[in-house]
């Protein structure tokens, strides 16, 4: 399944982007540690690296740092050139033309194509849209919930404050500071350039194309 997701996504980007080396940004972890094979979003990146010279910018994915701790390790194991990007720097890197495409995994997709993924994904999609570069979300068809009309119906988990107040046992802020720590955010379908599952590619992303890949 993940191999097909990877090949479909890589073929699309290879065909649509200008020839030559590429820089792709990703967020959180969507590789073998989160799925089977080489993963979903990272599976697309790995397959694309077999077609083009590729450099990957992996966002940290605070506060649990899945990008820094997991994705960077997987990219190294795959032999893909990469660098770690500060989360807050990512939109600016996109705006200044240092990124050719953004590729992420996904946690849930509504019937209209709204995508829930690791918090911070929405900001990357906004930046990609403003810069006119592809934002691709990749995942299994089982993550598509046709019973959900739109992303506003997706429940967003609010995680514990201590994940933000401290890191690796070191306090980062004033003890007891109130914290907002949503685990996910929702990217509207209008910002998703393409949605990839093992059943195909939804593009443009709308109710009909999403149903076809669910």
What is each residue range found by the language model?
Residues 53-54, 59-214:
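Conserved phosphate- and dinucleotide-binding cores of soluble alpha/beta proteins
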Residues 1-85:
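N-terminal active-site beta-alpha-beta segment that forms phosphate/nucleotide-binding
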């Amino acid at each position: 399944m993940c191999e097909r997701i990877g090949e479909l996504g890589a073929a699309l980007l290879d065909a649509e982007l200008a020839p030559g080396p590429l820089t792709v940004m990703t967020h959180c972890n969507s590789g073998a540690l989160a799925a089977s094979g080489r993963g979903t979003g990272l599976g697309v990146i790995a397959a694309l690296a077999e077609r083009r010279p590729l450099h990957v910018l992996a966002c940290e994915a605070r506060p649990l740092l899945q990008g820094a701790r997991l994705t960077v390790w997987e990219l190294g194991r795959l032999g893909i050139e990469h660098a770690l990007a500060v989360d807050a720097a990512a939109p600016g890197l996109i705006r200044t033309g240092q990124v050719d495409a953004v590729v992420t995994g996904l946690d849930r997709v509504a019937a209209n194509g709204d995508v829930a993924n690791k918090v911070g994904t929405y900001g990357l999609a906004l930046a990609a849209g403003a810069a006119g570069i592809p934002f691709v979300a990749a995942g299994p068809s089982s993550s598509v919930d046709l019973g959900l009309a739109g992303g506003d119906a997706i429940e967003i988990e609010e995680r514990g404050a201590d994940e933000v107040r401290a890191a690796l046992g070191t306090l980062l802020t004033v003890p007891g500071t109130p914290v907002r720590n949503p685990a996910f955010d929702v990217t509207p379908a209008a910002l998703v350039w393409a949605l990839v599952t093992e059943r195909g590619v939804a593009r443009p992303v709308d109710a009909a194309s999403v149903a076809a890949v669910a």
